[in-house]
Amino acid sequence: MWTRRQRQMCIRDSKKSGPVKKIMSLIKDEDLLIKEGRSIKDEEGHLIVKVKIEEQNYFFKKYRIKNAIHGFSRLFKKTRAYNSWIAFNWLTAVGLHAAEPALIFIENGFLGNRHSFLVTKEIKGQRLDDALSNSANFDTITSGIAGFFKRLRWINFQHGDAKTSNFFISGKNIIALDLDAAGYENFFSRFNGVSRDKKRLLKSIANYPKLHNKLFKRI
């Protein structure tokens, strides 16, 4: 019950956070959220719904605890919504672009964090995989992706799931999405973090040999 569990909410900017009361009402009622929005993905591990509120489109991403084993495995970890929030701040601090969070919400249970929400504003632009299939400018994409990986190396950071569907292109800017697996590289991950991102990105552009060859040399 809502009265029996603590909640944590973080709003990035009160002037830009949008209609918080409406957002919270949808977070509290999953059925209402699905009814008023358009379900993008509904899986055991997460739910994504697009909702239009006061002429602004928002994406609600709910990170679900699948079962008791999954819950126990995440008992001493930060929620994926919180991790996305922290990653956004790391990336923007070094001049990179990422999906802007409007709000994160963390549900706390007796044994720690449970479900969590990340609410982001809709991005103007085109998903990178769609842009590639529509014959986008490879030079712009090459420059943007190479710059993204270069700055990740500056701060020993990793995206965690660097495939084309997790990036948008808006003008000349590359915008990162889905940062719940992103993070600062510690001693154990430093040797394979960015390289794993590189392998994932190159695999996702295997059908575009010209772009693949350019990025292989630059990232």
Which residues does each predicted region cover?
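Short, conserved glycine- and acidic-residue-centered signature motifs
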Residues: 3, 80-84, 194
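Short acidic, glycine/proline-rich loop/turn micro-motifs
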Residues: 69-74, 130-134, 187-189
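Active-site acidic catalytic loop and adjacent metal/ATP-binding pocket
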Residues: 48-51, 59, 149-185
